[in-house]
Amino acid sequence: MSLVTEFKEFALKGNVMDLAVGVIIGGAFSTIVNSVVKDLIMPVVGVATGGLDFSNKFILLGHIPPNFKGNPDSYKDLQTAGVAAFGYGSFITVAINFVILALIIFMMVKFINKLRAPAPAEAAAPPPTPEDVLLLREIRDSLKNSPRV
């Protein structure tokens, strides 16, 4: 088999194509989750915490250069200028994105597994009572009904 033929078989197998589709959809889905966190959840968290904007929360690690023309309270401006800063607010936002994404994926997998699960089988009829048990029951019943001596 030639290298081209082997690669063609590999690339056109169902699993590789499924993976490619999953990566593309995952990229689009990530954008949606980022928007949900940035535009819907973080503003609510900001209001709940008294108007805090987590994206601009940082600890300055270096010195701001004298020719710095940006906003010294803007993490993005400081990053652009090459100032060392520990951006914990950005990390909090990314961590929330991850938790929400993981929760949504978990719920989707759970839903898909529920759809794939086979329908519960009907309860099987109980097995017939063995003959020796039936015979013992007959003996018991006849002893109950017989007069005592």
Curated annotation (Swiss-Prot):
Cellular localisation: Cell inner membrane
Residues that span the membrane, as ranges: 16-36, 40-60, 89-109
Keyword hit for Repressor: no
GO molecular function ontology, one term from the record: mechanosensitive monoatomic ion channel activity
Membrane topology: Multi-pass membrane protein
UniProtKB keywords: Cell inner membrane, Cell membrane, Ion channel, Ion transport, Membrane, Transmembrane, Transmembrane helix, Transport
InterPro entries xref list: Mechanosensitive_channel_CS, MS_channel, MSC/AndL, MscL_channel
Gene3D superfamilies assigned to the protein according to its UniProt record, in alphabetical order: Large-conductance mechanosensitive channel, MscL, domain 1
A Pfam family annotated for this UniProt entry: MscL
GO cellular component: plasma membrane
Summary of subunit composition and partner proteins: Homopentamer.
Functional summary from the UniProt entry: Channel that opens in response to stretch forces in the membrane lipid bilayer. May participate in the regulation of osmotic pressure changes within the cell.
Similarity annotation: Belongs to the MscL family.
Protein name: Large-conductance mechanosensitive channel
